[in-house]
Amino acid sequence: MILLCRQYRKQLSELMSTRHLPVLLDESVQGLRAERGGVFVDATLGGGGHAEKILEAHPDNIVIGIDRDAQAIARTQKRLEAYGDRAIYVHAPFSSIESVVEQHANGKVDGILADLGVSSDQIEDRDRGFSFMQDGPLDMRMDATRQKASAASLLAEASEDEIESWLSTYGEERFARKIAHAIVKQRRFGQLLRTTQLADLVERTVSRGMGGHHPATRTFQAIRIAVNRELDEVSMLLECAPRLLVDGGRLAVISFHSLEDRLVKNSFRNEARSSDFVNVYKKGIVPCSDEVRSNTRSRSARLRVLSKETT
């Protein structure tokens, strides 16, 4: 871990040219054993930091990058241009991984990586509507070209019980009922269309208290998960990804909150009960102190790795 922290300090200066810093970069690429060479899937291509590290790990490595965000793919194509046809780009949700691997790798790959977090590029783009910290349209769609329902339309049409369920389940929000009631009551005065409208409504409904997170943090997380059906996507990925691995292949997943991590932990535990799979890190790996200080987004990250071992 000390060595990885030193490596992280070196990487930080190299990565500061982009807003988004990949989390657990060395740990995840080492977990995939990418230095052995092979075909890998980055199921959440994002800014391309993990994909680039995999491509650097071996001169013959090929990365199939999947992302439902067309803007992210366009940016990353420029970043990885030097790698030519070793980098393949697919605009799709990662629940489509089985058909993607069938099309581009004859059904089997040496490793799969999924970083389940929202990228800094998405959060900092006010027009995407992910953040309560700046005013923007209440959108939150990962793929506005293919997804019809934005956060604004979802909140305008859902029942109070549905909204409460999202807040309670996806945001683990203890004031879910109170906030849901306030959202529905607001409809009498007009639709919530802006991020600051929703954030202000939650703040008026729930006392900020002393320090800690903004009171709208859990609400925004919950609505984002609902809009993008994120946990359904994760469940579908975890169901099909293990069978896409060659013998010795690995699946590495980085989660950022307890709901995701619980899904990953339970899935890996169930797979490991079979003689075909090994849960490589029983408790997972968390970022070193240097990474957390330099990139606060990483503080809740946890990496879990599953290995296919049929010999």
Model segments located where?
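S-adenosyl-L-methionine-dependent methyltransferase catalytic core, i.e., the SAM/SAH-binding region
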Residues: 2-311
